UniProtKB/Swiss-Prot annotation:
Organism per entry: Campylobacter concisus (strain 13826)
Protein's GO biological process: proton motive force-driven plasma membrane ATP synthesis
Record family assignment: Belongs to the ATPase A chain family.
This protein's name: ATP synthase subunit a
Keywords from the UniProt entry: ATP synthesis, Cell inner membrane, Cell membrane, CF(0), Hydrogen ion transport, Ion transport, Membrane, Transmembrane, Transmembrane helix, Transport
Origin: domain of life: Bacteria
Keyword Cytoplasm: no
Main location: membrane
Membrane topology: Multi-pass membrane protein
Entry GO MF terms: proton-transporting ATP synthase activity, rotational mechanism
Xref: InterPro entries: ATP_syn_F0_a_bact/chloroplast (IPR045082), ATP_synth_F0_asu (IPR000568), ATP_synth_F0_asu_AS (IPR023011), F0_ATP_A_sf (IPR035908)
Length: 227
């Protein structure tokens, strides 16, 4: 039923094309926003530059609170801020009738979760060394190490599942809710729903970015605590 509302169906009806088309559209929007914000930069921010700078400062503040270091927060800013842009615009675009949320596809959310998973483990190994990082999985008690290590490995792998399915499930549910509202009352009744779904899109973006910083904090915490 949702396909009836999609403009992309004018080009191709396949689900793979629909999600690829809307992800490319999201990427284009992000590039345009970045270009406009950078092309007219002023000492006193105005317009879009002001919004983007406020967003970046908010991400840095979030990272500082999570990591306990502004230096580390700025170090991981490009990753977290980029993921935030992708998740936000992927969520919001689906609220507009005729468009689909790329984040309502498990493919995208799984890729984003894998990027976070691979990167924070890479940072953990780079900061602490291979043996020290994975040795931390065994816990402080050597006798419990054979039990703790597989438990920790499973716990870390489950983060990929929780990150991807949380975002996918929430946005897919939002899409179905919006579809029901548009079907039952296509004009004025969905307006409160649009506001609620926008709030949910922002909330899911915040959660994804926060968890990214939390996982990074856990990965680099071994060496940071020693310093």
């Amino acid at each position: 039923m949702k396909d009836l509302f999609l403009f992309s169906n004018l080009l191709n009806h396949s689900h793979a094309f629909v999600y690829a088309f809307h992800f490319c559209l999201v990427a284009l929007i992000i590039l345009i926003v970045a270009y406009i914000a950078r092309s007219k930069m002023q000492l006193v921010p105005r317009g879009l530059q002001n919004i983007v700078e406020a967003y970046l400062e908010g991400v840095i503040s979030m990272g500082k609170d999570t990591l306990g270091s502004e230096k580390l927060a700025r170090k991981y800013l490009p990753l977290v801020a980029t993921i935030g842009f992708i998740v936000f615009f992927s969520n919001v675009i689906g609220i507009i009738p005729g468009f689909e949320s790329p984040s309502s596809s498990l493919n995208l959310t799984l890729v984003l979760a894998l990027v976070v998973f691979i990167y924070y483990n890479f940072e953990g190994i780079r900061e602490n060394g291979f043996f020290k990082y994975f040795g931390h999985f065994m816990g402080p008690n050597k006798f419990l190490a054979p039990i703790m290590f597989p438990v920790e490995v499973i716990s870390h792998l489950s983060r990929v599942v929780s990150l991807s399915f949380r975002l996918f499930g929430n946005i897919k549910g939002d899409d179905l809710f919006l579809l029901a509202m548009l079907t039952l009352a296509p004009w004025f009744a969905p307006l409160p729903a649009f506001a609620l779904l926008t709030l949910m899109a922002v909330l899911q973006t915040f959660i994804f970015m926060m968890l990214t910083y939390v996982y990074l904090a856990g990965a680099v915490a071994i060496s940071e605590h020693e310093h």
